[in-house]
């Protein structure tokens, strides 16, 4: 889908391109999440609703951004069923045990395995692709970074296209401002229209450039790419 002129927006610390209406909804959802104070004891969470829960599939749930995403989505148990994708390591299993919830399903798998990705995507209404190999691991293992980050994105696109009704699936891809290169002083700001220019030897950024291009050229009806900047865990 061609990028509409009105689709360019900056908000909540993200650069957004793609489906304009979806971008606005994504930013509004972020703002609403921070304003809300729902818990599992809140009657709103368990309220009976006539509409079925939407299934939100999320990768990267054990990382900083993924953990914060779960914190915002899980309290909305009356609206969303969360399907979280995680690598089955001991550390990840312990981490996911701590956030067990009635509306949380964990899909254990590998981002490099298409069958695992398909289990995550099947039946989902929304797919949030946060998971990726990042620096410093990306600097140490460049080939694995390219394989994992690009391959997982292509697998998600393929899995969405294989759904009975691909047009009902909304894909949120998380990229990075590193796609447009360094932001060292004195030019330490960025804009959506900046040219793609990843820094030399930055394989993480390069993998994100190719992945975003794959999303852009995918032909999916509903997609958006959020070029995230940086973030800190809420407990630090």
For each predicted feature, which ranges?
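Active-site Tyr-X1-5-Lys
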Residues: 185, 199-224
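Flexible, glycine-rich beta-alpha linker
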Residues: 179-181, 202-203, 223-236
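Glycine-rich NAD(P)-binding loop of the Rossmann-fold in SDR/ketoreductase-type enzymes
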Residues: 112, 144-155, 198, 202, ...
């Amino acid at each position: 889908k061609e990028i509409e002129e009105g689709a360019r927006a900056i908000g909540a610390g993200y650069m957004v391109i793609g489906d304009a209406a979806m971008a606005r909804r994504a930013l509004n959802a972020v703002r609403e999440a921070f304003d809300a104070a729902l818990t599992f004891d809140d009657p709103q969470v368990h309220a009976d609703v006539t509409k079925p829960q939407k299934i939100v599939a999320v990768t990267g749930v054990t990382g900083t951004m993924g953990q914060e995403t779960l914190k915002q989505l899980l309290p909305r148990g009356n609206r969303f069923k969360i399907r979280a994708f995680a690598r089955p390591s001991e550390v990840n299993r312990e981490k996911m045990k701590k956030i067990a919830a009635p509306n949380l399903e964990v899909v254990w798998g590998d981002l490099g395995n298409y069958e695992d990705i398909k289990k995550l995507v099947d039946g989902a209404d929304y797919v949030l692709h946060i998971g990726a190999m990042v620096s410093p691991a990306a600097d140490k293992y460049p080939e694995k970074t390219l394989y994992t980050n690009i391959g997982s994105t292509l697998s998600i696109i393929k899995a969405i296209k294989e759904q009975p009704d691909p047009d009902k699936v909304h894909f949120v891809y998380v990229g990075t401002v590193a796609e447009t290169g360094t932001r060292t002083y004195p030019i330490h700001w960025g804009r959506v229209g900046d040219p793609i220019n990843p820094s030399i030897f930055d394989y993480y950024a390069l993998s994100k450039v190719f992945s975003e291009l794959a999303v852009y050229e995918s032909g999916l009806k509903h997609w958006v790419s959020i070029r995230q900047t940086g973030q800190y865990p809420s407990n630090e």
